[in-house]
UniProtKB/Swiss-Prot annotation:
A motif (Cell attachment site) lies at residues 126-128. 1-hexadecanoyl-sn-glycero-3-phosphate binds at T209, N230, D311, H474. Residues 28-35 form a propeptide. This is Autotaxin. 1-tetradecanoyl-sn-glycerol 3-phosphate binds at T209, N230, D311, H474. One of its GO terms (molecular function) is lysophospholipase activity. It is found in: Secreted. Binds 2 Zn(2+) ions per subunit. Keywords: Calcium, Chemotaxis, Cleavage on pair of basic residues, Disulfide bond, Glycoprotein, Hydrolase, Lipid degradation, Lipid metabolism, Metal-binding, Obesity, Repeat, Secreted, Signal, Zinc. Its cofactor is Zn(2+); Ca(2+). Residues 586-607 have a biased composition (Basic and acidic residues). Residues 854-875 are annotated as: Required for secretion. N-glycosylation, but not furin-cleavage, plays a critical role on secretion and on lysoPLD activity.
Length: 887
């Protein structure tokens, strides 16, 4: 089982136990475990048993699906976890006599109930044959030797209401292991080549087992379901959760609704999802096959198999060790036993199988360890969750001297070869979704791949020899390629011989619900984004309804009404050009504008614009106008080079969209337009920013959402300096934003044959990953009502086929998105004192994001007008550009 830097050859933990009011549980058991140098848990091994009672018998009860409560003894697959098995459980339920396979000499044997499985003539009717019985004794072929076949409809025996689902989960299966192919893993390779597969599946952060297994089960991020690590402390409970502690059995730690509970609540039977480690893999497979043979009214519809390998070997030998071949062969052999067993039951064209991992594995050793004692003088005053990531809290909750910001400062950019980066949790990249939970410590260390972090050397080298007992680990940033894992779907409901783009594991819960005909519980996935995996779709997503329609300004205010402290119009030469520039701002119109709200038609100090209505070209809104999904008031402002949705509440655009061709030129800003800001005569002075606020607030400056550098003409450049294109920016952040607009946008347009860019502000002061309400915004430009964003976003869309220009694309789209933290310093980049070309693009890659993340943080909905199907658009929205090399 996954653990923080596990060492040595010891029995691993299989899975946590969690009992809920319905009679299904998920379970972890601990054999007596050797204390490991990198183990997060307490040094003493606690008893995991709420009660112990061995009276009674397992005769006729082996692996019963109903969990028996205390004080009776148990015979289910998790009784070992609770030390509550009946006294004869091992004798009756864990038989191993004569092994797990038929041989020629066993065919037609006299039934012996002591055998692990049977090769007798009656074994098929009794459902307890060895999985290779038909092959050895009846001359049939192994499943793996049969040709791929397209299963267009489920071929199930009578009585099966729906195709059963078997989830075959493997711990620590790095995606690149699949490159070993059929020579090492012929059965898994056949599942991949004949079914649906992705190059990899992205785990959630942290890339540890507990968080990811429970994410697979619930579709929730760790910050949402509460299992934020393999170990954690809850300050409200004043309790700690560890692999071997009794707390893991307490339901209060586990949030959300896992799949087996969803199934039970909707009348669908679920088999066990987790297994005690003492139960051999072969017995687990045989038990699942026996459950599939139960009468219709007893047979579950969903099952799960869990393997502790190849994680255990990956930790011990590293992902590249030659010793990894045998564990992978053993996993493949188990897959073959399952598929042969299904074929033997005539269920191989009926059952859907998902082969899935929880995370990958990286090459890590003790020699690559950063010690906080080299940075801090008080490491004995802190508690560090160590290893491939670091979580820091005060050792004593009463330590009044503990100051997270001081610790962050003492850990930031102190060495040129530093291998970790400290963050306050709210400043972590938004794509990690790792802040909004009290169990996540305030200080977080993102550790470089292949490295560890510890408090001091004594925490690692506890033995006099100082020998390192591990060669691999996981837990790193979930976009790192070595952390990616495997996904394969095979069966009648999955597509045949289909490769799909990578996706995140939060999406699988919805797919599994679709396979079982269930309505998913609320989760972080985007239902419908993986419809392309399935042959037929039971769920068809629909576009959300727009909540707030925009205003279309139909008048303009007189120049004399504005006293915003802006210094630009007096620089316009000749003077009569000012009125001409303002006339450029008239509403260009469209069918939407004709039927929309035109604000204000009467005012003694206002004059109507040219009344003609021109057909609006979609040059800058290639995929339709973003919809606002909450109640507010905003205006659509048209310009030659860009369009904006201007918020009357925030006094800045919610979004600004523009399209840049491959041939676009970057122009300089004339000296007389430096520090230029113009009033926008279409927007009331009361709904405009006041430039004087920036003169009063010495800590704040401003920038523009549409870059003046990319204006198409000298006249259009004046549009870019409108106050309605202005947003508050810290001077340090302006360096990032200016380089992005001046250099990177042009670079992306050149590389991709043109791009559409949508940018805007984000407000997430409570760091819950959702749009803040007005009441939740905490910071304003001094002396004003101008709110200060916590982040800025940018969505860059082009044609996937770069031979097609962005504005003429008739095929799939490509997207790169960013959520850039808006902070008063650039300390995240240790070389920020250098030229922006040395660090800004790397900073942006760190803060890459999904469009879906941006939608949650802004309350906007993008890509609403396109010829692509909505499911295809959802797939685009959930895509993350990782900037990693190929797996």
């Amino acid at each position: 089982m996954a653990r923080q830097g596990c060492l040595g050859s010891f029995q691993v933990i299989s899975l946590f136990t969690f009992a809920i009011s319905v009679n299904i549980c998920l379970g972890f058991t601990a054999s007596r475990i050797k204390r490991a140098e990198w183990d997060e848990g307490p040094p003493t091994v606690l008893s995991d048993s709420p009660w112990t009672n061995t009276s009674g018998s397992c005769k006729g009860r082996c692996f019963e699906l109903q969990e028996v409560g205390p004080p009776d003894c148990r015979c289910d697959n998790l009784c070992k976890s609770y030390s509550s098995c009946c006294h004869d459980f091992d004798e009756l339920c864990l038989k191993t006599a004569r092994g797990w396979e038929c041989t020629k000499d066993r065919c037609g044997e006299v039934r012996n109930e002591e055998n692990a499985c049977h090769c007798s003539e009656d074994c098929l009717s009794r459902g307890d044959c060895c999985t290779n019985y038909q092959v050895v004794c009846k001359g049939e072929s192994h499943w793996v030797d049969d040709d791929c076949e397209e299963i267009k409809v489920p071929e199930c025996p009578a009585g099966f209401v729906r195709p059963p689902l078997i989830i075959f989960s493997v711990d620590g299966f790095r995606a690149s292991y699949m490159k070993k192919g059929s020579k090492v893993m012929p059965n898994i390779e056949k599942l991949r080549s004949c079914g649906t597969h992705a190059p990899y599946m992205r785990p959630v952060y942290p890339t540890k087992t507990f968080p990811n297994l429970y994410t697979l089960a619930t579709g929730l991020y760790p910050e949402s379901h509460g299992i934020v690590g393999n170990s954690m402390y809850d300050p409200v409970f004043d309790a700690s959760f560890h692999l071997r502690g009794r707390e893991k059995f307490n339901h209060r730690w586990w949030g959300g609704q896992p799949l087996w509970i969803t199934a039970t609540k909707q009348g669908v039977r679920a088999g066990t999802f987790f297994w005690s480690v003492s139960i051999p893999h072969e017995r687990r497979i045989l038990t699942i096959l026996q459950w599939l043979s139960l009468p219709d009214n007893e047979r579950p519809s969903v099952y799960a198999f869990y393997s502790e390998q190849p994680d255990f070997s990956g930790h011990k030998y590293g992902p590249f060790g030659p010793e990894m071949t045998n564990p992978l062969r053993e996993i493949d052999k188990t897959v073959g036993q399952l598929m042969d067993g299904l074929k033997q039951l005539r269920l191989h064209r009926c059952v859907n199988v998902i082969f899935v991992g929880d995370h990958g594995m990286e090459d890590v050793t003790c020699d690559r360890t950063e010690f906080l004692s080299n940075y801090l003088t008080n490491v004995d005053d802190i508690t560090l969750v160590p290893g491939t990531l670091g979580r820091i809290r005060a050792k004593s909750i009463n330590n009044s001297k503990y100051d997270p910001k001081t610790i962050i400062a003492n850990l930031t950019c102190k060495k040129p070869d530093q291998h970790f980066k400290p963050y306050m949790k709210q400043h972590l990249p938004k794509r990690l979704h790792y802040a909004n939970n009290r169990r996540i410590e305030d200080i977080h260390l993102l550790v470089d791949r292949r490295w560890h972090v510890a408090r001091k050397p004594l925490d690692v080298y506890k033995k006099p020899s100082g020998k390192c007992f591990f060669q691999g680990d996981h837990g790193f940033d979930n976009k790192v390629n070595s952390m990616q894992t495997v996904f394969v779907g095979y069966g009648p409901t999955f597509k045949y011989r289909t490769k799909v783009p990578p996706f995140e594991n939060i999406e699988l819960y919805n797919v599994m619900c679709d396979l079982l005909g269930l309505k998913p519980a609320p989760n972080n996935g985007t239902h419908g984004s993986l419809n392309h995996l399935l042959r037929t779709n039971t769920f068809r997503p629909t576009m959300p309804d727009e909540v707030s329609r925009p205003n279309y300004p139909g008048i303009m205010y007189l120049q004399s009404e504005f006293d915003l402290g802006c210094t630009c119009d007096d620089k316009v030469e000749p003077k009569n050009k000012l009125e001409e520039l303002n006339k450029r701002l008239h509403t260009k119109g469209s069918t939407e504008a004709e039927t929309g709200k035109f604000r204000g038609s009467k005012h003694e100090n206002k004059k109507n614009l040219n009344g003609s209505v021109e057909p609006r070209k979609e040059r800058h809104l290639l995929y339709g106008r973003p919809a606002v999904l909450y109640r507010t008031s905003y205006d659509i402002l048209y310009h030659t080079d860009f369009e904006s949705g201007y918020s009357e509440i925030f006094l800045m655009p919610l979004w600004t969209s523009y399209t840049i061709s491959k041939q676009a030129e970057v122009s300089s800003i004339p000296e007389h337009l430096t520090n230029c800001v113009r009033p926008d005569v279409r927007v009331s002075p009361g709904f405009s920013q006041n430039c004087l606020a920036y003169k009063n607030d010495k800590q704040m400056s401003y920038g523009f959402l549409f870059p003046p550098y990319l204006s198409s003409s000298p006249e259009a450049k004046y549009d870019a300096f409108l106050v309605t294109n202005m947003v508050p920016m810290y001077p340090a952040f302006k360096r990032v934003w200016a380089y992005f607009q001046r250099v990177l946008v042009k670079k992306y347009a050149s590389e991709r044959n043109g791009v559409n860019v949508i940018s805007g502000p984000i407000f997430d002061y409570n760091y819950d990953g959702l749009r803040d309400t007005e009441d939740e915004i905490k910071q304003y430009v001094e002396g004003s009502s101008i709110p200060v964003p916590t982040h800025y976003y940018s969505i860059i869309t082009s044609c996937l086929d770069f031979t097609q220009p962005a504005d003429k694309c008739d095929g799939p789209l490509s997207v790169s998105s960013f959520i850039l933290p808006h902070r008063p310093d650039n300390d995240e980049s240790c070389n920020s004192s250098e030229d922006e070309s040395k660090w800004v693009e790397e900073l942006m890659k760190m803060h890459t994001a999904r469009v879906r993340d941006i939608e949650h943080l802004t309350g906007l909905d993008f890509y609403r007008k396109t010829s692509r199907s909505y499911s295809e658009i959802l797939t685009l929205k959930t895509y993350l550009h990782t900037y990693e090399s190929e797996i």
